[in-house]
């Protein structure tokens, strides 16, 4: 069987995008997702994105995300920007703004005249039980409006903020993001048993009150060149701690994102993320019988 696909990226976070809206697709088993995402024997991607017909009122499309390990996850901000470019470029809609069903609700994606996409990422959640994060036996430390939690990692204690952007994040502020042992600490934090659904680990260096550098070790994908939900979680944590002011420019290895949040006034306000979405190539792959 032949499978048509589009390869895209958002700030270097790369995706295989499949159209399940206008055509029938084979079942997306864990094995098939892993095969497509394999960088040596497949197409290669951090995640696979699936466009489907919505199942809830008020949505134009349904957006599903699969990590390169085959597991389906709740949200991906960089993928959301690629999603709206895909559906417009492939004639599935001519709307500048589309409403998209994801696991935790419906989000709005808007294509701007300059080619960048603005994503309404929704409001962050800080309650540990809803991230989820198990705080039993831990003594938190207040910093601004936030609570930091101690986590033993490779013989050291790391103080983290926990945030949900529809998916779980652990954010810590570091002195030097480039020098920090992300590839050692990231896997340990990702699989810490206090995170029953595992977690995305963010490492943020504050450059100024409106600028940060960020690396993210993503759950099920490892360190990626950019992580949209990770950028939102990091900025929300920094504003809540009193160390950042909106808007914030987030520098990742793959590019730059702009995050805006009026959370200092109202924590129920949505985070808005602006950034690029790029089509790399279109292709067809032969699937094993």
Curated annotation (Swiss-Prot):
Cell compartments where the protein resides: Cytoplasm
Residues at the active site: 76, 227
Top-level class of the enzyme under EC nomenclature: isomerase
PROSITE patterns named in the record: DAP_EPIMERASE
One BP term from GO: lysine biosynthetic process via diaminopimelate
Record: residues binding substrate: 13, 47, 67, 77-78, 167, 200, 218-219, 228-229
Catalytic activity, EC: 5.1.1.7
GO-annotated molecular function: diaminopimelate epimerase activity
InterPro entries on file: DAP_epimerase_AS (IPR018510), DAP_epimerase_DapF (IPR001653)
Reaction catalysis annotation: (2S,6S)-2,6-diaminopimelate = meso-2,6-diaminopimelate
Domain of life, source organism: Bacteria
Swiss-Prot/TrEMBL keywords: Amino-acid biosynthesis, Cytoplasm, Isomerase, Lysine biosynthesis
Site, as annotated: Could be important to modulate the pK values of the two catalytic cysteine residues: 169, 218
A GO CC annotation given for this chain: cytosol
Pathway named in the protein's UniProt entry: Amino-acid biosynthesis; L-lysine biosynthesis via DAP pathway; DL-2,6-diaminopimelate from LL-2,6-diaminopimelate: step 1/1
One of the Pfam families matching this protein, by short name: DAP_epimerase
UniProt subunit comment: Homodimer.
HAMAP family: DAP_epimerase
Family label: Belongs to the diaminopimelate epimerase family.
Function: Catalyzes the stereoinversion of LL-2,6-diaminopimelate (L,L-DAP) to meso-diaminopimelate (meso-DAP), a precursor of L-lysine and an essential component of the bacterial peptidoglycan.
Name under which the protein is recorded: Diaminopimelate epimerase
Organism of provenance: Burkholderia thailandensis (strain ATCC 700388 / DSM 13276 / CCUG 48851 / CIP 106301 / E264)
Lineage of source species: Bacteria, Pseudomonadati, Pseudomonadota, Betaproteobacteria, Burkholderiales
